[in-house]
Structure formats: structure tokens, C-alpha cells
């Protein structure tokens, strides 16, 4: 995924959650993926063909809904002068809203990563897999496994291992040939080992340096002892890559299977690195909490109050937080109320209820996502926002014990 703020990633994830929960009847939901190099004229022609074919659908209701969705897409495409550089995705169709009713709904997404394949898809649910893949971790790590006879170079991109190079050596075994002195043989062997290490270093540097320096998070080296230690001590990698070495790990294999073995051996280290910033922020919060310094706030009302007086230094929001601030108003007597509800994708809109003063029906006048509201307040006061995963104990505790909302303050406010 291209560089996104944590809040943009949250918004993208939330939007996909909402789409995932929408269901239609038969094949009434259309997903249209348009890559950046696709001509709009070609897309329009295919949609017109699909509209004609939809006339053959036996069910009148399904036929009407599918053709209506295609007409909606054609109408939108008329206003699209150029496909965005990452492509564009349209979702439209008759969504089941219960009580044997449907609602024609549409959503447009410009993805954070480029779309590579054109796709027109009709089903009872929206086709989301390519967009969901963009949410997956795309951090890149250099992988190198070696001994004195073989080396394999690869990359770990997200969760996928990509082998790049395999090298073999001409380093002689420990038994010398007849006619050579032991000293001479040992000298030749050490030269051959050094030359092989240099070949490995040059090849690995070429592969790893081709990765954008912002994406390459580190280098992992595996193999038997003392080979990997010798290679590391000899500084055969480019000097910029030497700074990125995260650790040396024991592996039995130095072929492609050795790359998988290396990733497994370094699994805990990789997970710690990915979560380190989050862990440090949450631990700082607990440290201040235990010290009773008064420089923490938690829960929606406390944190909101401190955000409003610009006293928040670090805002902690759980990645699993789903909450809305709902405003209801009585049009008869003017009574107004604000309240918060936790929500899950696909749940119905909050019931407004009746006015406690005059008994008239209340209407929902505003619904604001808590994450949007708090992120905007934090932005205004230059507070750092950290989205916290529940994949580690402290992150889970933040969600379960503190409602997914906490803050480290710049000073004790007493609020």
C-alpha cells in the first residue's frame, strides 16, 4: 500500500467492512474494477452489451434491478474524464434492506494501490478481494541464507516470500588434494570462501538496494554457524544495508526452503518490529497511569474534554473501535440530545425514539464517527494519533478495559 496515514487506512478498512455486509438477491450487485490503462470507451461498450444481455433474465425484478445498476454505472462514467492513476472501483446494485425491500446503493473507491486487472462482476455480494488484499501488510524485508557452498537471496513482501537468486561456490572441501601443502591448501580455501562471500554480498546488495529505501524495513540473515557470523563480520553487504540487519538466525537449509525457515525463525522479531511503535505508546500510557501522574485520560468523555483544551500529546485509538456520535432532535419542542453507540457493520441505523419532553418522534440529525471526530481534534492541536492493534496483550487491554480510547497528556489537567 502506498503511504497512507493511519486514519486513511482506518477509513478504507471501515468502508470495505460496510460493503462486505451488503447483500443482494441473485446477481443484483455489480462490482466494476477499472485499471488506469483501461479506456473508458471500452468499458462503456461492455456495459451496454451487459445491459442488453440482462434483458434475458427471467425474473422481472432481478432484470429491472440489474439493468438499473448498469444504467447507474453508465451515467457515472459519462462524468469520468480520465481514470485515476491507481484506477477506480464502482459498486452498485439493489441491496436487501429487510422487510422484503431493496435499496439501490452505489459506492465509488479510488484505491490506495494500483488496480492491475479489469473486472466486471455480478453476484449477491460485492467482489472485494483485490481491495482487501491492499490492507495486508506490505512491509519488505531482505532475506539471505548461506553456508560455504550455497546461498539464496529473496524478499519477504507482506506475508509472501519471493526468491530472487541462488548462488553456488567452488570452495574446496576440507580434504586437500595430493601434492599440496596443508598451508597452501588452507590459503586457497580461505581465498575461495572470501570470494564467495563477496559474490553473495554483491548479489544480495543488488537485490535489496533495488527496493525503495522507505519500503525495505530490514535484512535477515540465516544459515549455520559460523558461516553467517563470518559473513556479517566481513561487512560484505552495502554499507547502507549493514545498518538494516535485524539479526542472524540459525537455519539448516540454504536453498529456497531455507528462506521459509528463516522467516519462521525470525517470526517473533518481525512481529515485534511491526507492533513496536504501538507497544511503546501503550506502555507509556500504562506507565503514566500506574505512576498516578495525572497525565493520562481514558474513555470517550475524558479524552474528548482534553482534546478540546489541546492538552493531549498522544491519542491512542484501537483499530477495532467502531463508535458513532448520534444527534437526535425534536422538531416540535426543539429538544436535542447527543449520545454514543457502538456499532458493527451492517447494523441498522440507530432508532431515534420519542422526545422525553413532549412525546413527539425524534429524528436523527447527525451521525459522526468517533474516530473521525477525535482524529480531527487531535490534528488541530498537533497531537500524535496512534492506532493500536489488538494482536498483543496491551493492545487488547486498551480495547477491552478502556473502550479503545485513551490519551497521554502534556500536563495534568484534572479533567
Curated annotation (Swiss-Prot):
UniProt-listed InterPro entries: eFR1_2_sf (IPR042226), eRF1_1_Pelota (IPR005140), eRF1_1_sf (IPR024049), eRF1_2 (IPR005141), eRF1_3 (IPR005142), Peptide_chain-rel_aRF1 (IPR020918), Peptide_chain-rel_eRF1/aRF1 (IPR004403), Ribosomal_eL30-like_sf (IPR029064)
Pfam family, one: eRF1_2
Gene this chain is encoded by: prf1
Subcellular location: Cytoplasm
Lineage of origin: Archaea, Methanobacteriati, Methanobacteriota, Stenosarchaea group, Methanomicrobia
This protein's UniProt keywords: Cytoplasm, Protein biosynthesis
Transport recorded as keyword: no
Similarity annotation: Belongs to the eukaryotic release factor 1 family.
Protein name: Peptide chain release factor subunit 1
Species, as recorded: Methanosarcina mazei (strain ATCC BAA-159 / DSM 3647 / Goe1 / Go1 / JCM 11833 / OCM 88) (Methanosarcina frisia)
